[in-house]
């Protein structure tokens, strides 16, 4: 923390203090002070970007939005995102692949994976490639139905289980295939 004679207090990273050679009693011109403020803003945005990326998978757009939401100047946020991209710490394609892999591990359907990509603000240009690798979820659906229906199930339990699968992003046709494998398909089940 640096305190100026006029009472202004600035929280600076050690690197910024060293870059400007700050010490007690240093006289600064207005121009030097403005450069210090700009450098402090840049460093703040970069360090916050590093913390965000270390905590979760984010796209370029999502990182910039989060930096601005946390109080960073939009210019500093944009520069910090570009700095992270240049250092190959933010890669939208890699993030999209990680999101889809996480959805597969959780047993979500393609619709839920698309929703996750949208929520993370992944550009749509990457969606087709990463979703093309999505495996068939019929075995997962069958396993889910077997685990949640048990022996003494009725129409109400079947309806709940299929609704849960729909919420998890599986399509009617995929659920229909799972029901057919278990010989549980009823005439009431919709086509799509």
Language-model segments: what does each one mean?
Residues 1-192:
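An alpha-helical, amphipathic repeat domain used for nucleic-acid recognition
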């Amino acid at each position: 923390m640096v305190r100026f004679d006029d009472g202004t207090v600035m929280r600076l990273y050690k690197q910024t203090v060293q870059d400007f050679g700050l010490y007690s009693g240093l006289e600064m011109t207005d121009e030097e002070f403005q450069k210090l403020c700009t450098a402090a803003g840049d460093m703040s945005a970069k360090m916050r970007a590093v913390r965000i990326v270390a905590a979760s998978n984010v796209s370029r757009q999502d990182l910039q939005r989060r930096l601005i939401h946390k109080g960073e100047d939009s210019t500093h946020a944009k520069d910090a995102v570009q700095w992270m991209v240049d250092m190959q710490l933010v890669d939208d394609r890699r993030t999209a692949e990680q999101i889809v892999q996480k959805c597969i591990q959780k047993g979500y359907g393609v619709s839920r994976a698309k929703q996750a990509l949208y929520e993370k603000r992944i550009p749509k240009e990457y969606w087709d490639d990463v979703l093309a690798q999505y495996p068939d979820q019929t075995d997962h659906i069958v396993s889910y139905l077997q685990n949640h229906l048990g022996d003494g199930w009725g129409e109400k339990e079947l309806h709940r289980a299929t609704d849960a699968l729909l919420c998890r992003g599986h399509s009617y046709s995929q659920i229909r295939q799972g029901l057919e494998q278990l010989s549980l398909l009823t005439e009431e089940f919709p086509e799509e």
